[in-house]
Amino acid sequence: MSSLISFIFLFLFSFLTSFKASAQDPFYLNHYCPNTTTYSRFSTYSTNLRTLLSSFASRNASYSTGFQNVTVGQTPDLVTGLFLCRGDLSPEVCSNCVAFSVDEALTRCPSQREAVFYYEECILRYSDKNILSTAITNEGEFILSNTNTISPNQSQINQFIVLVQSNMNQAAMEAANSSRKFSTIKTELTELQTLYGLVQCTPDLTSQDCLRCLTRSINRMPLSRIGARQFWPSCNSRYELYSFYNETTIGTPSPPPPPSPSRAN
């Protein structure tokens, strides 16, 4: 493992140098809004969608839990939406991210009935279908990874993949069995290198659906890289060789979200 340690250190050093240089970049990551179904600007659906987005940006939104879902209107103009903030972040950071994503939503997806927006701190999602309590792993995928492989040696790559996968799978089990559907890991690979991981599902999923979603998410990541993340609308996974989450808040979980969705009229 000694040669693997040196490769980890070398690539991590070069990555952290570039990471610090881009620390001030916007926290927007990606979005997905297919043109399969659309709406017109002055339609009932448009009004309902704006009502839903306004409720997410209001003072009464569930920023303290980091998760909220809302349904507005009646079929065929019914809109269902949710936001999910990263589980280690404060209500203030959650609020800022949700407000920012709401403000940009109709600019990025001006006429699509279905959309998901990925940010560093939160996810915003809405649809004309019932998206609550349903794990989505067949659309809206987004993968981001470091370009550096952990080592040019295949044996060392295989060792690293086993370590990452086993630790991330453990985190997935813990998340699936928690009320917040969120978990982190911190594992010392060597005296000099530590693996950090984070997994999260929307809390409306069952334990089984959350675990299934996270397992697929972990398997979709290129685990030979020195860092990667994968997003679906229902769950996401990330691992790095540097600390990227707020460790001080992990030990004090927020209260679980309400069991049933709220409804804005």
From Swiss-Prot:
Gene Ontology CC annotation, any one: apoplast
Residues modified by glycosylation: N35, N60, N69, N153, N177, N246
Ranges where the Gnk2-homologous domain occurs: 27-131, 142-244
Transmembrane segments: none
Coiled coil: none
Lineage top rank: taxon: Eukaryota
InterPro entries cross-referenced by the UniProt entry: GNK2 (IPR002902), GNK2_sf (IPR038408)
Induction: By salicylic acid (SA).
Entries under CDD domains matching the protein: Gnk2-like
Main location: secreted
Signal peptide per UniProt: 1-23
Compartments where found: Secreted
Protein keywords: Glycoprotein, Receptor, Repeat, Secreted, Signal
Keyword Repeat: yes
Pfam hit, one: Stress-antifung
GO terms (BP aspect): programmed cell death; response to salicylic acid; systemic acquired resistance
Family: Belongs to the protein kinase superfamily. Ser/Thr protein kinase family. CRK subfamily.
Listed name of the protein: Putative cysteine-rich receptor-like protein kinase 9
Source organism (scientific name): Arabidopsis thaliana (Mouse-ear cress)
